[in-house]
């Protein structure tokens, strides 16, 4: 039963995501022209994102992880190829332009938003053709650490599910 519905009076007290107030383009309420999006300036991370974007293929379902893989979405759309594949993130957005930084987990011009458990059902069932994941640490044998670096315990998130079920995985990072 619902005891009460509380409507937030001050939008600043109820952000849609860490990096924005309500944005209807991230809920599917409306679409914005792709030319209106801001693209990140050239940097080492964007260069890696540009190289990784060269692995994109038409008609594939793609998962983008947190960190450097966030740049791939923007690069794909900056180059005019973002509509040729379906970009997803584990939080649930399907299609559109997945966002990075404090907006990570959202997608502008999203086509669908799945509850996260259903997104993982799709991932676990082999629905991802190509995954781009960050690597916090890698050793000479190719072992990847994404869960604990120094005193920070980030946890593995969806890394295990995605790496074990995606048809192809591309790791993105600096050394």
Please place each PLM-identified region on the residue numbering.
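N-terminal active-site beta-alpha-beta segment that forms phosphate/nucleotide-binding
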Residues: 31-116
């Amino acid at each position: 039963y619902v005891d009460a519905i509380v409507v937030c009076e001050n939008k600043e007290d109820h952000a849609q995501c860490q990096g924005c107030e309500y944005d209807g383009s991230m809920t599917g309420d409306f679409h914005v022209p792709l030319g209106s999006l801001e693209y990140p300036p050239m940097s080492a991370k964007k260069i890696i994102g540009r190289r990784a974007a060269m692995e994109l293929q038409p008609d594939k379902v793609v998962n983008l992880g947190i960190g450097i893989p966030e740049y791939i979405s923007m690069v794909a759309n900056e180059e005019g190829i973002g509509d040729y594949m379906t970009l997803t993130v584990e939080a649930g957005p399907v299609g559109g332009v997945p966002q990075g930084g404090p907006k990570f987990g959202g997608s502008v011009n999203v086509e669908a938003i799945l509850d996260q458990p259903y997104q993982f059902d799709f991932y676990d069932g082999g629905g991802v053709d190509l995954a781009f994941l960050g690597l916090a640490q890698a050793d000479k044998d190719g072992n990847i650490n994404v869960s604990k670096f120094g005193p920070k315990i980030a946890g593995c998130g969806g890394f295990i599910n995605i790496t074990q079920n995606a048809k192809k995985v591309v790791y993105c990072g600096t050394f």
